[in-house]
Amino acid sequence: MSESTWAVPDSRKLTFDDADEPVTKLQVRVVNGTVNVVGTEESSARLEVSSVEGPPLIVTRDGATLTIGYEDLPWRGFLKWLDPQGWNRSAVVSLAVPAGADVEVGMVGAGAVVSGIRGRTEVRGVSGDTTLVKLAGPVRAESVTGNLEAQAVTGELRFKSVSGDLTVIEGAGGRVAAESVSGDMLLDLDPTARATDIRLTTVSGEVAIRLPHPADARVEANTASGAVSNAFEDLRISGNWGTKKITGTLGAGNGTLRATTVSGSIALLRRPADEEPPFEDAPGENPPAGDAASGGPAPEGASSPADDQSGSAGSTKKVL
């Protein structure tokens, strides 16, 4: 298929229906606004641009690759777009693509929701928050100040940020690797998940991990000056002054959990075996307000999953 290009200066809907060569790669690059991507079982791809402010969006179909962005905002090196002059634009973009497609999203000041993708997902952002829902393929996310929330992600998850927070709900992937300078990290693991390799590193951020009970992992968590708390009797807390550690083996030790922070606190929480939803409210507490993420593209920015909250059960040992 030859390359086709469209300039989109305002609201518009486009359908890319080519059964012989469906879209297998999606690239989206926007400044401000919202990006919503949902995977479907259809062979066609659909684009809905709800609003455009500033220069028009450029839509390009080159074979199996669909690109939405600006001529002056390349995928590589787009973090250079910290010049305020480049922020005088905005777009709300929603896409439905085959679930097996690879998805790349780059945004400056924009928020993104990606759901239902089985291919590779890569998200790069400066200040916008990102929500990932039910992704089965490998995921890589990079951010400066934007937060990342991943819900029911079963693929490998890698996250890097300067000050953005990481929240994982119903985590069921085989590997989670996260690095941050000051961002907090909150993980709640799905009790049905296979053995997981978790490696978390932050300088001043706090780390909280809720594991199913019984759990199956070799644990090594340490902080130089923060507090530590542990809800598992099989784990040992050592160190009273300076560096504190939580070490030991849970179950057969098939998984790995390593967490390191310099000045932040570390908490290992336990979910009872019979607890069903993650972060369930304790009796008497009011549930947080918020709407769940939309399962499909919406003309106006889709809302992200309900705000998360953590909880633990059982006795907790804490060292200050």
Could you tell me what each predicted segment is?
Residues M1-S143, N147-L320:
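Intrinsically disordered, low-complexity terminal regions
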